[in-house]
Amino acid sequence: METPLKEPESSLESYNEPSSCTSERDVTAQERAKQGEELLAQLHRPLEACTNSCYCKQCSYHCQLCFLKKGLGIWYARQGRRRRTPRKTKTHPPPASDKSISTRTGDSQPTKKQKKTPETTVVSACGLGH
């Protein structure tokens, strides 16, 4: 007598077991929840000092402090570069009294000296003779 061939039972068992897709979905949902919690924890953590002085796009988004400093272009600290000279210090030399007023005020138009030419004297002389 021949023994009948048995069908593999594993194929039937796979239909009865829950699919692995649902377990993968649960794992990814848990990972996302953990990432969200880590991000919230990082937001509430005080900012650490960053010594990166480059202003390229990659370095601007390096960390939260770099983004606040470089990415937004807003700087809340005092900047020493824009200091003006104190008012007590005189930047201009005292005006000399022998100079004319136009020279002190800085008129850019020079005064023209009129030269008498023989033609103008001849014309006026002819006018008197008539």
Swiss-Prot record:
User: What does UniProt give as the signal peptide span?
Assistant: none
Pfam families in the record: Tat (PF00539)
InterPro entries reported in the protein's UniProt record: IV_Tat, Tat_dom_sf
Localization, per the record, is: Host nucleus, Host nucleolus
Segments for region (Core) = 67-77
**Keywords, comma-separated and alphabetical:** Activator, AIDS, Host nucleus, Host-virus interaction, Phosphoprotein, RNA-binding, Transcription, Transcription regulation
What superkingdom heads the lineage?
A: Viruses
Name the segments for region: Cysteine-rich.
Answer: 50-66
Segments of skewed composition (Polar residues): 11-22, 99-108
A single GO molecular-function term is: RNA-binding transcription regulator activity
Q: Where is this region: Disordered?
A: 1-33, 78-130
Chief subcellular location: host cell
Q: Name one GO cellular component term.
A: host cell nucleolus
Annotated motif Nuclear localization signal, and RNA-binding (TAR), positions: 78-90
Q: Which residues cross the membrane?
A: none
GO terms, biological process: positive regulation of viral transcription
Residue positions where Phosphothreonine is found in the record = 85, 89
Basic and acidic residues biased stretches = 23-33
Protein family per UniProt: Belongs to the lentiviruses Tat family.
Job of this protein: Transcriptional activator that increases RNA Pol II processivity, thereby increasing the level of full-length viral transcripts. Recognizes a hairpin structure at the 5'-LTR of the nascent viral mRNAs referred to as the transactivation responsive RNA element (TAR) and recruits the cyclin T1-CDK9 complex (P-TEFb complex) that will in turn hyperphosphorylate the RNA polymerase II to allow efficient elongation. The CDK9 component of P-TEFb and other Tat-activated kinases hyperphosphorylate the C-terminus of RNA Pol II that becomes stabilized and much more processive. Extracellular circulating Tat can be endocytosed by surrounding uninfected cells via the binding to several surface receptors. Endosomal low pH allows Tat to cross the endosome membrane to enter the cytosol and eventually further translocate into the nucleus, thereby inducing severe cell dysfunctions ranging from cell activation to cell death. Through.
Q: What else is known?
A: This isolate is from a Gambian case of 'neuro-AIDS'.
What is known about its subunit structure?
Answer: Binds human CCNT1. Also binds to CCNT2, but the resulting complex is unable to bind to TAR RNA. May participate in the formation of a complex composed at least of Tat, P-TEFb, TAR RNA, RNA Pol II.
Q: In its UniProt entry, what is this protein called?
A: Protein Tat
Q: Which organism is it from?
A: Human immunodeficiency virus type 2 subtype A (isolate D194) (HIV-2)
